[in-house]
Amino acid sequence: MSILDYLRSLQKRRSASIAKERLQIIVAHERNGLSRRTLDFLPLLQKELLDVVRKYVEVSDSQIKVNLEKNGNYEVLEVNIALADAEGRFSMS
């Protein structure tokens, strides 16, 4: 393994970690007295998140789980994407 290969592998791990952290971000929107139409952006946000992931990683719809929950005054959008490891096995991120 050359030094360039090593540095590239570090970059990939760093990029993967950053992507994973970004996807694990829970979008919470406080709805104190706000109308329901203020949450209309959530489906568009979901689509854009998936488009960004698909730009860098090949994933099928079956590898993606999206959950929208209401917790009190908050709406929580959770996105989980199963990514293949080096051996091609999938695990939920």
Swiss-Prot record:
GO biological process, one term: regulation of division septum assembly
Pfam families for the chain: MinE
Annotated InterPro entries: MinE, MinE_sf
Keywords per UniProt: Cell cycle, Cell division
Top-level taxon in the UniProt lineage: Bacteria
Family: Belongs to the MinE family.
Described function: Prevents the cell division inhibition by proteins MinC and MinD at internal division sites while permitting inhibition at polar sites. This ensures cell division at the proper site by restricting the formation of a division septum at the midpoint of the long axis of the cell.
Name of the featured protein: Cell division topological specificity factor
